[in-house]
């Protein structure tokens, strides 16, 4: 075995391929992936050119098509074990000899037609690339209804089509006779790039055209193998926008997602905005933790003022940012990643020198310094129920800062500046899927035999989702730097983490309640069995008794564990409250919490007084959790006073009298609606007010005081 090379078991691919053959018909640059997608012909131009080409040779092919049609009908009633047919009735050339001269003639005719069309398309591609208007390239691509489906469209489907009906009619015209017409949908199972070059090369394009003419059968075989790639990758495009609306830039300082009274709904809106126009329900059902997912928003300003290089410089100038703790400086050369951190405070000029030397910069916790990133991470915490962190990566032009690796988190990559080329590889086996720990650094030899599911550019304004366990590596463009924000979710919130928290205490309690499990092991148990294969004196009789006893214990213990699902979730919730970011409050929310000042002056004598008619509401749905320590004691743990640095402060909690627990439950049930203090329905009115005051003083509650409103 070559030193440094890692061996991995091959993955058994049993995931359904979603109509991958539909992608291939209009693919005109399989061997020339270095051509930027913005220089491709639009779908409308391809379809129009195809139609004209077909019309020019249709009369010459009429007799051959009639004969082939009769032949195909006669063959329909025969078994076709080896007969391969694509969605558009293109026959695979490897099997033609089995089906007579008529079928062979038909395929040759179609090949001639296809070659003529490719030549015309390539000539037109060159003309378009020379005359392309850069101003038009910044425009948004027009889209259609967001529906997850197996139907496929290639990258420039609706670029220059101003009339959606015209485009739909063009697609219908190109469908074969008798083929079922499907609704146009948004999902594109993208083709994976084959080349490693990121620059356009017109000379290679001409060479590829000749190669394709000579090796057309090889193209078909290559595409059939690529179909397995598409099961792990989904791509969709941004919605069509009016010219006036396209100039609107999101402003995170205005808390744009804090529009609902329910904090979970606000979080869902934030995720929907990130993956727009893809459907949120379909994302969690079909994509999340299953596939790499790319959204081309086609809007360089899509992320507004979320973060920028200017903001990073401002952080370095105004905050105490330290090497190792907040910033890492790394360089990747000769398949090795080296960390070149300094010591102490990070200064802008030092970062400037590092970037000039080809080093990448990682800001490990931008949410601690940038309110906009903090705000967005907090929104997602309400949905995922875990700490949501972020990283900023600045990569100089023509460099790669980090080695190939996988993460122990699900990552949303937001390309804020420049562009970056990503290569992503699927896990080789189920053992590598959804890992709980990050990997080490891989080399090119480690990934050479892995399934490449994504090999493409992430443009400014785009979003790329990478599930846990997918090896990935990024390269900046040769002419421009890259700055992207990685939002990390779902770290340490697996079922395994839940069981790790519940099984040890559950086993202890189970032993206290079950006398049989407290019995000593039988005499001479050492002679019953062991891992070493040898003649144990009591192997037959002793092992049988031991297994029978353990089977009974395990069966009862599993039943006991199932009854602990409720406290197990509470334990996970407690961990979330301990590690999560504190909530970001709007001005209106601050004015209705303990953060506001009663009256107009800190030195005034006004005081907020709770009455039975005071309107109250929890500040967040998942800002707090009531935990029962025993039947006689409970407490509330919350994240309202947490640090913006991960685990920067100890856990914050306070005791709650058990008799007030029902009132707290009524308050939780009322969310997201407002309710009166009297609606808490504790034992008496005094307990209602006592509970409201306790929650309010700890920052969990919003209240509307009539005197203050007046």
UniProtKB/Swiss-Prot annotation:
Family label: Belongs to the ROX family. NO66 subfamily.
GO biological process: negative regulation of DNA-templated transcription
Positions of Fe cation binding: 405, 407, 472
Protein source organism: Brugia malayi
PANTHER family for the chain: MINA53 MYC INDUCED NUCLEAR ANTIGEN, RIBOSOMAL OXYGENASE 1
EC number: 1.14.11.-, 1.14.11.27
Keyword Oxidoreductase annotated: yes
Role according to the record: Oxygenase that can act as both a histone lysine demethylase and a ribosomal histidine hydroxylase. Specifically demethylates 'Lys-4' (H3K4me) and 'Lys-36' (H3K36me) of histone H3, thereby playing a central role in histone code.
Region (Disordered): 103-137
Co-factor note (free text): Binds 1 Fe(2+) ion per subunit.
Domain JmjC, residue spans: 359-506
Keyword Nucleus: yes
Official protein name in the record: Bifunctional lysine-specific demethylase and histidyl-hydroxylase NO66
Protein location: Nucleus
